From Swiss-Prot:
One of its GO terms (biological process) is arginyl-tRNA aminoacylation. The keyword Nucleotide-binding applies. Belongs to the class-I aminoacyl-tRNA synthetase family. One of its GO terms (cellular component) is cytoplasm. This is Arginine--tRNA ligase. Monomer. It catalyses: tRNA(Arg) + L-arginine + ATP = L-arginyl-tRNA(Arg) + AMP + diphosphate. The keyword Nucleotide-binding applies. It comes from Chromobacterium violaceum (strain ATCC 12472 / DSM 30191 / JCM 1249 / CCUG 213 / NBRC 12614 / NCIMB 9131 / NCTC 9757 / MK). GO terms for molecular function: arginine-tRNA ligase activity; ATP binding.
């Protein structure tokens, strides 16, 4: 049980003893050190409900509150807020236990089978900056959920089916490139652009492309051979991007739209049998009372077009059906642009009505905002084109390399490259993961690569700073007792004890920025501790204790940054 959970439980019991059994404790970390380590603010609401004086109720709660061995001071502030000051000895023992534990003292959870669907690019084209947020937010969530003990299934629901592949096949056959064995992704992109022009301008070409889609769906071996080549070339590119980005998606996590192709007619038939389908202008539509048009009529969701074709909503329904029936998932998280919120809400509703997803299986759309340029518009090249993700990451490394070369010109080129990779890629990722995912944010190289403020370089440097202490300390005792006497020691220890609460918040709300802000707080508090409490210049038990706090700080920073998918360095 975390300190927060423990205090919440004890305050809840005290509220019940004081005559307010249904009142929430509302315990949270103190906003300022002078308010203690935790504040319990539930008395105000309880007093209002009971129509009694909040200060008098607070006195009853404090009298009934049992925090022996946990807090050394509990006081009432203002009209009825309860400030709780943790006992230094209690924090010291918690810190020692966390340091000795591989998981930093995190209690095992009841494991759920959780799928995180993220990245999911359309194939036959290069990944662009629009894929960055889904890839890194989803990866951070998967890492955190796995770390706390859930059974995580990563899913890369790539767009590997549909008209664009018919267009590509038609163009390659027409231009006699269909037998090329060494197709590159850049070739496919060029071919696709040309194929799109032909598709829009020539009815004959468009019909041929559609015929190839039908052949593809029908399992024509020659067309399938070309399709597999397109998919393989595309996925190799994606894997290169994921490796550079330090994202944990592999080939085995790919289950694309094509995987559900054979299920789609069955799904439409099952929807029909359940009385959910209506034919509208030749199309098969599910009308949902829960969603209304501007004319206040039920909104329709097409699942089969009048030409017999299916759309991505049908595929997504098929994926939910498969994930429940075959994978037995407890929770499915879709990390997709916030602008798709209505699509997911409608798709989830259809799945519930059809019985494809029981209420016990949690379906969540984890949306996110847009990455903007300095002009406040979606991030583009200077010419207004789409920025390729690999080019953005390469630029991040080159900018970081220039910074490292300027700060440490004596390092070898290999050392500079290693640092540039960790700092450059880390900077791009952290600039995103440190923001509330629902917010749009401005992409700015200078801000994200700064070694001051809430940035990856600052946190990476904070970690190396702690490690430098241990390189100088020749007599570190990993079993030394922690003794907390100074305010800076206590503030650092109290914050380090909130690691589990922070991860629980990330798991519950799917907000990685909670972890980012926590790590920045730890780095800031360590800096204050380092200045106020000399480590190497102190002696005996004090020195040994402070080295232990430094070790726990390093372990927490390293673990936290790894959960965000950001590399640390032993020196910079």
């Amino acid at each position: 049980m975390t300190i927060h959970q423990l205090i919440n439980e004890r305050v809840q019991a005290a509220l019940a003893a004081a005559g307010a059994p249904d009142a929430p404790a509302v315990v949270q970390p103190a906003s300022k050190p002078e308010f203690g380590d935790y504040q319990a603010n539930g008395v105000m609401g309880a007093a209002k409900a009971l129509k009694t004086n909040p200060r008098a109720l607070a006195e009853k709660v404090v009298a009934a509150l049992d925090l022996a061995g946990i807090a050394d001071k509990v006081e009432i502030a203002g009209p009825g807020f309860i400030n709780i000051h943790l006992a230094p000895e209690y924090l010291a023992r918690r810190s020692e236990a966390a340091l000795k534990d591989d998981k930093l003292g995190i209690a095992p959870v009841k494991p759920l089978r959780v799928m995180v669907e993220y990245s999911s690019p359309n194939l036959a084209k290069e990944m662009h900056v629009g894929h960055l947020r889904s890839s890194i937010i989803g990866d951070a969530l998967a890492r955190v959920m796995e770390y706390v003990g859930h059974d995580v299934v990563r899913a890369n629901h790539v767009g590997d089916w549909g008209t664009q592949f018919g267009m590509l096949v038609a163009y390659l056959v027409e231009t006699r490139h269909a037998g090329d064995a060494d197709l590159q992704l850049s070739d496919l992109e060029t071919f696709y652009r040309n194929a799109k022009i032909r598709f829009d301008e020539s009815e004959d070409f468009a019909n041929t492309a559609r015929d190839y889609v039908v052949k593809l769906q029908g399992g024509d071996e020659e067309v399938l051979k070309l399709w597999r080549q397109f998919v393989d070339v595309s996925l190799k590119h994606c894997e290169d991007v994921y490796e550079k980005l330090n994202v944990g998606l592999k080939r085995e996590h790919v289950r694309g739209e094509s995987s559900y192709n054979d299920d789609l007619p069955v799904i439409v038939q099952e929807l029909r049998e359940k009385g959910l389908l209506t034919e509208d202008d030749g199309a098969q539509v599910v009308f949902l009372d829960e969603f209304r048009t501007q004319e206040d009529k039920p909104m329709g969701v097409i699942v089969q077009k009048k030409d017999g074709g299916f759309i991505y909503t049908t595929t997504d329904i098929g994926a939910v059906r498969y994930r429940h029936r075959e994978l037995k998932l407890d929770r499915v998280i879709y990390v997709v642009d916030a602008r798709q919120s209505q699509h997911f809400a409608q798709m989830f509703t259809i799945c519930r009505k059809a019985g494809f997803a029981p209420e016990a299986m949690k379906l969540e759309h984890v949306g996110f905002g847009v990455m903007m340029g300095d002009d406040g518009k979606p991030f583009k090249t200077r010419s207004g084109g789409t920025v390729k993700l690999i080019e953005l990451l390469n630029e991040a490394e080159e900018r970081a390399y220039a910074l490292v070369s300027e700060k440490n010109p004596d390092l070898s080129d290999a050392q500079k490259r290693e640092i540039a990779n960790a700092v450059g890629i880390g900077a791009v990722k952290y600039a995103d993961l440190s923001k509330n995912r629902m917010s749009d944010y401005i992409f700015n190289w200078d801000t994200m690569l700064a070694f001051e403020g809430n940035t990856a370089p600052y946190l990476q440097y904070a970690y190396t700073r702690v490690q430098s202490v241990f390189r100088k300390a020749e007599d570190y005792d990993a079993n030394a007792r922690i003794v907390i006497t100074e305010p800076a020691e206590k503030q650092l220890a109290a914050a380090l004890a909130q690691f589990e609460d922070t991860l629980n918040s990330v798991v519950e709300g799917c907000y990685p920025h909670y972890l980012s802000l926590y790590l920045y707080q730890i780095a800031t508090l360590f800096s204050r501790f380092y200045e106020a409490c000399p480590i190497l210049k102190s002696e005996g038990e004090v020195r040994a204790s402070r080295l232990q706090l430094a070790a726990l700080t390093a372990k927490t920073l390293r673990t936290g940054l790894d959960l965000l998918g950001i590399k640390v360095l032993e020196s910079m």
